[in-house]
């Protein structure tokens, strides 16, 4: 639903809504930390001293995970073969938006290789001592390394994620004792060279679908391989110069990652992106895996030096909307590059991640560990997934002695709003029950991973999704992702329509038709300035200035937003256009078609209903837009 006003100069809008140890030769002083890296193998995730504990867990609380791992390893082939490393073929594909040709930005098939399975077989060998598993792991590594080099020769990425290659490096470390020097060299030298080849650099070839994501992202692309490559090969006498370089560069990147994430967390908790599919998916692996491998290679637990990371479960808790119809599938208000099809919170790895937070922070921050335990116990899957096969043998199992908070303590928290500064998210709620009212407001983000052009946007949930983030990312080959879903028009924001204004850039397929060239009144990259935030047991008040985001077409774009507990909202906008002829629009998106009666709009979704009363401007025109042919 759009409220459109084309008067000159300034528009003022107000809406009330009711709802819901190795010493490196020749290192300098800055590399003194290298002296703490142990000389022996294994040293990645566990070492000679901690291995008995790992094995004891495998024979005790994690026995089921061990038995399942052994069964998988028994089914793996004796002679593993890799595939799908040939040249990428560009072709015509059909999408919801029509037919177009794939490009270097289009997702491609991953190389079929055996890095992850080699790590499993390496663990199986260490658990059982049976040489058949050692031989499987060795052959898998040799075959995979050859495939990595073939893929590079064909200018294609092995995988968007570094996971399987990190595990290949771990597998080498874990079976090192069982290999001859020649066997070690045959694996580690080309493996480390592959890691070097795929790093970006002057004069190097472009690689199709290579993930170069740095510390601001999930850090699961090719830069993340450096630490593990260096740690696996350091001091082995085969490629020492490259190993030392990787170790140093990887260590530097990982420390920058930890600082970036710790600083971004603030005093409330955040993790690089406000999109749960990322922050509750693969993003935590980067810091946890560095914590694990630093601990196993040096004996030092770094976690206490980064206290902000302990707070991430707090963001999960505030993002979480209890689902009355299916308690195992909590909801959230929808944000950024998540699909927005069900707005289901990404809890598939909730047990795994919360168990990690407990493992590393239970002594440094007992309260955060208790909250993590509370969320862990609500995870629908009470086990650790097998992406990182060593995880079940390092932590988890609920034997950590951390007492979760009671339901009453979680449901009756007196605080009704939280400002996650780094994410630019204000989360408001009347309680923490299925029938409570939930709301988000977006302003002032400094962490912009997978964030849209949506400053001053709000969403409302009461029994169901009432004021929503619209659009969906689809399968990453549709034009909707770039030209609607990510743009201001898909959000509950203000538009100032200047004719033929270039559309802001976003990722996704490029459309060369006229619809793909021009902005529809939205904002550009940047962050709004938060002017005020106050919360108490009666109301929450937010004021935010997004003027600068609209560029020269805008003289003022200030939104004041009030949540009157439990379920009334007031939205007041001051909007000024530099050109009086530029149209202005106030957007509100619903799941279903609303009913408009005079200046009142009513929208239903499930058991929820939103009443929207337009107060100002006096001559506002209310217009419904949507339905077949006007979905975007």
List PLM regions with ranges.
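Bacterial N-terminal signal peptides
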Residues: 14-22
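Catalytic and substrate-binding regions of extracellular carbohydrate-active enzymes
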Residues: 380-631
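Carbohydrate-active enzyme catalytic cores, enriched for enzymes
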Residues: 233, 282-466, 627, 632
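Aromatic-lined, polymer-binding surfaces characteristic
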Residues: 43-45, 55-59, 63-67, 78-85, ...
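Bacterial N-terminal signal peptides that target proteins for export
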Residues: 2-14
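Bacterial Sec-dependent signal peptides at the C-terminal "C-region" and cleavage site
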Residues: 21-30
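Surface-exposed intrinsically disordered loops and tails
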Residues: 87-102, 260-274, 507-524
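Low-complexity, Ser/Thr/Pro/Gly-enriched N-terminal "stalk/linker" regions
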Residues: 29-101
């Amino acid at each position: 639903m759009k409220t459109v006003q084309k008067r000159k100069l300034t528009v003022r809008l107000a809406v009330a809504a009711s709802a819901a140890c190795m010493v490196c030769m020749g290192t300098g002083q800055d590399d003194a930390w290298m002296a703490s890296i142990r000389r022996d193998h294994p040293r990645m995730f566990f070492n000679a001293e901690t291995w008995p504990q790992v094995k004891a867990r495998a024979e005790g609380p994690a026995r089921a995970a061990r038995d399942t791992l052994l069964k998988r390893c028994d089914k793996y082939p004796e002679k593993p073969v890799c595939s799908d490393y040939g040249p990428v073929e560009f072709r015509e594909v059909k999408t919801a938006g029509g037919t177009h040709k794939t490009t270097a930005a289009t997702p491609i098939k991953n190389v079929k290789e055996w890095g992850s399975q080699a790590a499993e077989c390496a663990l199986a060998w260490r658990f059982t001592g049976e040489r058949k598993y050692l031989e499987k792991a060795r052959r898998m590594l040799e075959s995979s390394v050859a495939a990595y080099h073939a893929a590079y020769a064909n200018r294609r990425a092995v995988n968007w994620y570094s996971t399987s290659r990190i595990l290949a490096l771990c597998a080498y470390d874990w079976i090192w004792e069982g290999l001859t020097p020649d066997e070690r060299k045959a694996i580690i030298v080309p493996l480390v060279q592959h890691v070097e080849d795929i790093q970006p650099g002057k004069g190097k070839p472009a690689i199709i679908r290579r993930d170069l994501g740095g510390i601001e992202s999930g850090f699961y692309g090719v830069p993340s391989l450096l630490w593990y490559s260096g740690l696996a090969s350091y001091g082995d006498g085969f490629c020492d110069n490259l190993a030392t370089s990787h170790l140093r560069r990887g260590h530097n990147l990982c420390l920058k990652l930890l600082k970036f994430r710790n600083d971004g967390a603030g005093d409330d908790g955040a993790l690089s992106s406000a999109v749960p599919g990322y922050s509750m998916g693969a993003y935590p692996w980067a810091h946890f895996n560095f914590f694990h491998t630093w601990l196993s290679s040096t004996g030092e637990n770094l976690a206490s030096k980064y206290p902000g990371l302990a707070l991430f479960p707090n963001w999960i808790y505030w993002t979480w909307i209890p689902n009355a119809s299916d308690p195992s599938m909590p909801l959230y208000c929808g944000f950024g590059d998540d699909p927005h099809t069900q707005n289901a919170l990404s809890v598939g790895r909730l047990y795994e991640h919360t168990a990690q937070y407990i493992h590393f922070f239970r002594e440094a921050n007992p309260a955060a560990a208790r909250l993590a335990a509370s969320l862990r116990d609500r995870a629908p899957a009470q086990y650790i997934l097998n992406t990182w096969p060593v995880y079940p043998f390092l932590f988890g199992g609920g034997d950590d002695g951390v007492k979760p908070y009671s339901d009453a303590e979680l449901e009756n928290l007196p605080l009704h709003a939280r400002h996650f500064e780094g994410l630019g998210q204000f989360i408001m709620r009347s309680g923490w029950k299925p029938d409570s009212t939930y709301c988000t407001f977006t302003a002032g983000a400094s962490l912009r991973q997978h964030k849209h052009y949506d400053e001053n946007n709000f969403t409302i949930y009461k029994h169901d999704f009432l004021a929503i983030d619209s659009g969906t990312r689809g399968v990453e080959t549709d034009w909707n992702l770039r030209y609607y879903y990510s743009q201001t028009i898909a959000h509950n924001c203000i538009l100032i329509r200047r004719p033929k204004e270039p559309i802001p850039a976003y990722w996704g397929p490029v459309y060369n038709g006229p619809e793909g060239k021009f902005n529809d009144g939205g904002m550009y990259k940047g962050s709004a300035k938060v002017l005020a935030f106050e919360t108490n047991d009666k109301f929450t008040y937010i004021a935010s200035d997004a003027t600068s985001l609209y560029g020269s077409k805008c003289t003022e774009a200030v939104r004041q937003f009030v949540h009157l507990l439990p379920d009334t909202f007031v939205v007041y906008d001051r909007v000024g256009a530099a050109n009086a002829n530029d149209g202005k629009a106030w957007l509100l998106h619903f799941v279903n078609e609303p009913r408009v009666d005079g200046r009142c709009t009513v929208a239903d979704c499930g058991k929820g209903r939103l009443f929207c009363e337009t107060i100002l401007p006096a001559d506002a025109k209310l217009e419904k837009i949507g339905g077949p042919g006007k979905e975007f």
